[in-house]
Every structure is written in structure tokens, then in C-alpha cells.
């Protein structure tokens, strides 16, 4: 990747991360970059959103179960 392309990619990720924070998605920069890359490779964004939501539900349930134990 040349310098200009790398700079453009970085700026795009910065913008996406700012929007993500504004929308209070709770996604960190690394996770967001993975999700963007998956979308760029043809993965359905709605399916990814559903997976993220399900993983969050499962993690919350696991934490709740651990707190009760």
C-alpha cells in the first residue's frame, strides 16, 4: 500500500471511529477496523451487526452468571 492510500485508509478509519463513538456503539478501533474489512470483503453488514449484538448479549449473560456465582 502506498503512502497516500495508507493515509486515506487511516483517515477513513478515524472518521468511522468518530461516527461510531458519536453513536455510542461501544466498538473499539480495532474491532471497527475488522468489521470494516469484513464488509469490504463482501460480508453482509446486517449479518455482522446481528452477530455483534448476539455476542454482546452472550457476554452480558455470562458476566451476570459469573457475578451471581
Curated annotation (Swiss-Prot):
Localization annotation: Cytoplasm, Cytoskeleton, Microtubule organizing center; Cytoplasm, Cytoskeleton, Spindle
Keywords for this protein: Cytoplasm, Cytoskeleton
Residues making up the signal peptide according to the UniProt record: none
Cystine pairings recorded for this chain: none
Gene Ontology biological process terms, A to Z: gamma-tubulin complex localization; microtubule nucleation by interphase microtubule organizing center; mitotic spindle assembly
Protein family according to the UniProt entry: Belongs to the MOZART1 family.
Record text on subunit structure and interactions: Part of the gamma-tubulin complex.
Protein name: Mitotic-spindle organizing protein 1
